[in-house]
């Protein structure tokens, strides 16, 4: 192996600035690259009810613990405006119960009284 001290003696006279003539003024910082971001799939929700979805609305939705237009829209794959109208219809028929009504958010829950009345009909 050759001795290393010969190289060290040559470099010892030079300062750090002399070694890097490019970085005298600090150099240019690397540009930040933009992230690609997340791509969402386009929702293809129904604008009007078909027979199967309408039946599903009457069977399943009154059994949900938390019923909001967003929950109904996501589970039944229907538009939000259609979900709001459907929940108004269910409320009118007494299948669900209003918990809180706000300008932007309406919250319903299952009607406990309605299920008690419906249970004896199944037994008979």
Swiss-Prot record:
Keywords: Cytoplasm, Ribonucleoprotein, Ribosomal protein. One of its GO terms (cellular component) is cytosolic small ribosomal subunit. Gene3D superfamilies: 3.30.63.20. Residues 1-37 are annotated as: Disordered. Residues 27-37 have a biased composition (Basic residues). It comes from the Eukaryota. Disulfide bonds: none annotated. It is found in: Cytoplasm. Residues 1-22 have a biased composition (Basic and acidic residues). InterPro entries: Ribosomal_eS25 (IPR004977). Pfam families: Ribosomal_S25. GO terms for molecular function: structural constituent of ribosome. Component of the small ribosomal subunit. Component of the small ribosomal subunit. The ribosome is a large ribonucleoprotein complex responsible for the synthesis of proteins in the cell. Belongs to the eukaryotic ribosomal protein eS25 family. This is Small ribosomal subunit protein eS25. It comes from Danio rerio (Zebrafish). The gene is rps25.
């Amino acid at each position: 192996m050759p001795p290393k001290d010969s190289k060290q003696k040559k470099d010892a006279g030079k300062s750090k600035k002399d070694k890097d003539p490019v970085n005298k003024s600090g150099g240019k910082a690397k540009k930040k690259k933009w992230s690609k971001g997340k791509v969402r799939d386009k929702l293809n929700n129904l604008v009007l009810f078909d027979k199967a979805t309408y039946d599903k609305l009457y069977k399943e939705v009154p059994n949900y613990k938390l019923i909001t237009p967003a929950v109904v829209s996501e589970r039944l794959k229907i538009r939000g405006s259609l979900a709001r109208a459907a929940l108004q219809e269910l409320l009118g028929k007494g299948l669900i119960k209003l918990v809180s009504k706000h300008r932007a958010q309406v919250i319903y829950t299952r009607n406990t009284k309605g299920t008690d009345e419906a249970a004896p009909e199944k037994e008979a």
